[in-house]
Amino acid sequence: MGRVTSTAPAVEVVDLVKRYPKRDSNAVDGVSFAVRRGEVFGLLGPNGAGKTTTVGVLTTRVRATSGRAVVAGADVAADPPAARARLAVVPQRPNLDQSLTARQNLLFHAAYHGVGKGERVRRADDLLERFGLGERADSKVDRVSGGQAQRLMIARALMHDPQVLFLDEPSTGLDPQARLFVRERVRDLRERGTTVLLTTHDMDEAQELCDRVGIVDHGRLLDLDTPAALVARHSDGGTVEVVVTPPEGVDDVAGAVRQALERVDGVRGTDEMPAERPAARVRATVAGDPAALLAPVAEAVASTGAVVTDVRLGRPDLEDVFISLTGRELR
């Protein structure tokens, strides 16, 4: 079979269920979604939400209990080899062969997938240059940095020209320069027509890279849309964040400020944020325009005797949506 047509979804999931023995609930509980061809799609969720199991099914590593999953036109349960030939996975943790050079890692991967010798050499040279690894091509993998290893894993995954690329936390642990480079390469892949499905806990990364995102929790898909549409649908306010210095004799200035702010009309809730002592930082989530609440917020803080040293207004973002849908409880 060739590449899927432009109208067919790159990934299609229908009523997917995965139940593990001796578990009270399904790890994946009736999830359905479709990923468009050439799209960067983010699958987000807390630890244990079911996203890893869902990706495991899509990449043929986990067998579903019921439902249907298709990747690049191949049913992952009915024809796993065909699905594996059309997809590639870049794990969060490096799994490169440390005894080989960067180039050899790419060549061996392509040979495994049946790419001819001349073509795999050409692809390796091209990908090493595209991912800024040309000068490290003949270096042993155990001598490359973490950022270089991440880039090399993505390059290796592309050696058999997959139609769908699965990225697991692609920029975790990278320095800012390496993170920026990886994100630029993901955008480049989209321009070249490769479908990318990424899982990440980095909401900024998801908001910046993804055309659409699906948020899952407790095995179910809670919502799916563009980042902007999700923010508009689930957030209608913003935040007012204040940094204060305490009056003499007050040990818990953050607690006092939070209590005062929570009595202000329009304040939905407050959180204490990290700050250098003795200062305290409190963020209030508000309904409507946060600028309209500046005066009552200032009055509330003044009533505690604390002195405001900094104020910041914030608009809702994807992280606010994520917390709104999945809660604040640690997993």
Where are these predicted regions, by residue range?
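Catalytic Walker B motif of ABC-type/P-loop ATPase nucleotide-binding domains
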Residues: L165-D168
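Conserved catalytic motifs of ABC-family nucleotide-binding domains
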Residues: D161
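Conserved ABC ATPase "signature" region
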Residues: L107, A111, G118-R136
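A short, flexible loop at the N-terminus of ABC-type nucleotide-binding domains that lies
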Residues: G2-E12, V17-G30, R37, P80
